[in-house]
């Protein structure tokens, strides 16, 4: 492990919950930002089909 000596400074009983908690908070913030700044993501989570904005002409 490259950063194995961190546990000589921070106890694993403190460091691991902080690490996992910070990852959880960041994931929640990213999901909130995507949900609040897009219109399609909440529809996707609710199971609605995406609307086709424009048709593609071949040829």
UniProtKB/Swiss-Prot annotation:
Topological region Periplasmic: 36-59
GO terms, biological process: photosynthesis, light reaction
Binding sites annotated in the UniProt record for a bacteriochlorophyll: 31
Cross-referenced Pfam families: LHC
Transmembrane segments: 12-35
Record GO cellular component, one term: organelle inner membrane
Superkingdom of the source species: Bacteria
Entry's localization field: Cell inner membrane
Bilayer topology annotation: Single-pass type II membrane protein
Family matches, as InterPro entries: Antenna_a/b, Antenna_alpha, Antenna_alpha_CS, Light-harvesting_complex
Cytoplasmic membrane side: 1-11
One of the record's GO molecular function terms: metal ion binding
Predominant cellular place of this UniProt entry's protein: membrane
Keywords recorded for this protein, A-Z: Antenna complex, Bacteriochlorophyll, Cell inner membrane, Cell membrane, Chlorophyll, Chromophore, Light-harvesting polypeptide, Magnesium, Membrane, Metal-binding, Transmembrane, Transmembrane helix
Family named by the database record: Belongs to the antenna complex alpha subunit family.
Role this protein plays: Antenna complexes are light-harvesting systems, which transfer the excitation energy to the reaction centers.
Subunit and partners: The core complex is formed by different alpha and beta chains, binding bacteriochlorophyll molecules, and arranged most probably in tetrameric structures disposed around the reaction center. The non-pigmented gamma chains may constitute additional components.
Protein name as catalogued: Light-harvesting protein B-800-850 alpha chain E
Species the sequence originates in: Rhodopseudomonas palustris (strain ATCC BAA-98 / CGA009)
């Amino acid at each position: 492990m490259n950063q194995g000596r961190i546990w000589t400074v921070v106890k694993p009983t403190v460091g691991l919950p902080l690490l996992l908690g910070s990852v959880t908070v960041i994931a929640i913030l990213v999901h909130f930002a995507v949900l609040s700044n897009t219109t399609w993501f909440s529809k996707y989570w609710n199971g609605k089909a995406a609307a086709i904005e424009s048709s593609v002409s071949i040829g």
